Amino acid sequence: MVVSTVAVEKPSTADELARQLHDAASQKLAVVPVGGGRARGMGGVPERVDVELHTTRLDRVIEHSQADMVVSVEAGITLEALQHELAKSAQFLPLDPFSSPGHTIGGLLATGWTGPLRLRFGSPRDFLIGIRVALPDGTLASGGGRVVKNVSGYDMMKLHYGALGSLGVIVAASFKVFPKPLRDVTVTSEGGWDGADQALTMPVAPSALEIFSDGRVLARYTGSHDAVDRVIHDLGWAVEDQSIWERHSGRAPARWARIAAPRSGLRRLVEELPRGAGWWASPGIGVAHWAIASDAHSVIGMRAKAEAAGGTLVMLAAPDDFMREVGAWGNPPPTIEVMRRLRDAFDPDHVLNPGRYVV
């Protein structure tokens, strides 16, 4: 019997991580970057794993300028630790990903995971202002603001965001941060999709809006006292305890998928899910999450419907056999050839996360 041993590396500096990545790449060993491990089920089943390269010891706040509202951190810091630090200055990073707690900042950038607050603040890419990445050749490349060196010809922040560590390992990032709102109130109704439409058309837009398979709707309003109090009075929904969002962000089914579609078509797609399916959706964003309790055939069928509507169905977690049967990503995007050329340029031996990303 042959026993495969996976080496586990836990560097404490970016330079050390870059050296370890280069050492592995020079031996053509397959390297899997690991942050908090909260999204390890996302993507295809890795073809092989020789080295796990953990970032959790890269957990420092490098710089926080309260006046400039900018923070620079190492990639292994958890979102919770960063929020705790920012709260001392009445600031925050508007990230509330599912499968929390425990996400690292680097992991969130590599996966592109977001949460309900994306409705108001956008994705992390919208407030990411700088990034530093270790490449397989051992170099540390940077892009954006508060960095030392840019890689000519490439937008490093766009390249590495959501690329699942297939082009390099994120070691640090800088963000614009936001002041904590003066008022933060959540209200709820049983109004289903019509209730969600009502909340979206109020004079003050919600910062987050979620609808659930049982017809329940949550709307979160943030801002000045007068503006928030006026909109929740006019809406007339029941006030919900703010802890509901922490419980909501903890959702992490064993088998689940993210369905993204044009906002106008999201409701129709969700209504095509198998009867009795568990789901929740962000109608203002055009994203739904499906807790899968049906067979692979149902998932493949739903993906076809999503793609026909101009959307996607991406698996976020499933047992390996199920993932292989349905596929993680669906049909390749139109940019697949460009993505392959980039992969060949940054990682010519394909040592980073082989088999996991779409290329």
Show which residues each predicted segment covers.
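N-terminal glycine-rich flavin-associated loop
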Residues: 2-31, 55-101, 113-144, 182-189
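Conserved glycine-rich FAD pyrophosphate-binding loop
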Residues: 12, 43-48, 56, 99-100, ...
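A short linear hydrophobic-aromatic micro-motif
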Residues: 30, 94, 205-210, 276-280, ...
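Glycine-rich beta-strand-to-loop/alpha-helix junction loops that act as flexible
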Residues: 34-39
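Short, conserved charged micro-motifs
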Residues: 80-82, 192-196, 225-232, 265-273, ...
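FAD-binding subdomain of flavoenzyme oxidoreductases
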Residues: 95-96, 100-207, 217, 221
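Terminal amphipathic helices with adjacent charged low-complexity linkers/tails
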Residues: 220, 224-240
